[in-house]
Amino acid sequence: MKPSDVRSKAFAMPLTSPAFPMGPYRFVDREFLIITYRTDPDRLREIVPEPLQVTEPLVHYEFIRMADSTGFGDYTESGQVIPVEYEGQPGGYTLAMYLDDHPPIAGGRELWGFPKKLASPTLHVNTDHILGTLDYGKVRVATGTMGYKHKELDIDEQTKRLAGPNFLLKIIPHVDGTARVCELVRYYMQDIKMKGAWTGPASLELAPHALAPVADLPVLEIVEARHLVADLTLGLGEVVYDYLAQ
C-alpha cells in the first residue's frame, strides 16, 4: 500500500477494519438517569482543569442506556459530569465514564477525548423504580435509584439543558510516552427530540475502588434526579484550549 493510500484511507485503527465507523452518530430512545448531588468543593477544584471553573459544589452522576446507536450498537454507560463554566458559558465537564462496549470506548477516546473505561453498568426499571448500577470487575461501585415517573418535567426546559456545551480533556501520548495531544474539547448534543422527562425521590450510593474512584467525590446531599428519554445526535467536537501550545 502506497503512503498516499494510507493517508486517504486513514480514519481509525485497524486501518483495514476500524473499531468504529465514521458518523454521524445518532441515538434512538437514549435513556438517562441523572442524579445531581452536592459534594466537597475542594475536591472538585483539585480535579477540574483550568480554564474550566467550578461554580457550584455539584456533580451529575449519570446512568445512560443506549439500545440503538449508529455504529456503536447496544450498550450502557455510567459516570460523573461536573457543572462548570468556560469563559462565562455554563456546561458540563466529563470526569470519567464506564461502559460495556468496545466501539464507543475506542471512538469516544480517539475522536472526542471521552475518558472511557471498560466496566459493567446497567439501567432498567425494577418494579416501581428505575435502577442504575455500576460494577467494576466484581465490585459494585455505584447504585442509583429513583421513583418511576412520579412527576413530569418540562420537555422544553430539559431539551435546553441537554443541548448545552460539554467539555472533555483529550489526552493522547506520543510513542515515547510524552503528551502528543492535550486539549480541552467542547461538543454538543444535536437534533434532540425529547420524548419524556420525569423526576422523583432518589438515592445514590458510591463505594471506593482504586481504579473506578467515583467515591472520591462523596455524596453529601441529593439535589435533583431526572429520568429522560430522547433521540439525539452526538456532535463532533472542537478544540477550545491547547495545553501544549501554552
Curated annotation (Swiss-Prot):
Enzyme class (EC, first level): lyase
An example molecular function term from Gene Ontology annotations: acetoacetate decarboxylase activity
Residues forming the catalytic site: 116 (schiff-base intermediate with acetoacetate)
Stored InterPro entries: Acetoacetate_decarboxylase, Acetoacetate_decarboxylase_bac, ADC_dom_sf
Source superkingdom: Bacteria
SUPFAM superfamilies documented for this protein: Acetoacetate decarboxylase-like
Catalytic reactions of this protein: acetoacetate + H(+) = acetone + CO2
Function as written in the Swiss-Prot or TrEMBL entry: Catalyzes the conversion of acetoacetate to acetone and carbon dioxide.
Family named by the database record: Belongs to the ADC family.
HAMAP family cross-referenced by the UniProt entry: ADC (MF_00597)
NCBIfam families to which the protein is assigned, alphabetical: PRK02265.1
UniProt name for this protein: Acetoacetate decarboxylase
Species in which this protein is naturally found: Burkholderia cenocepacia (strain HI2424)
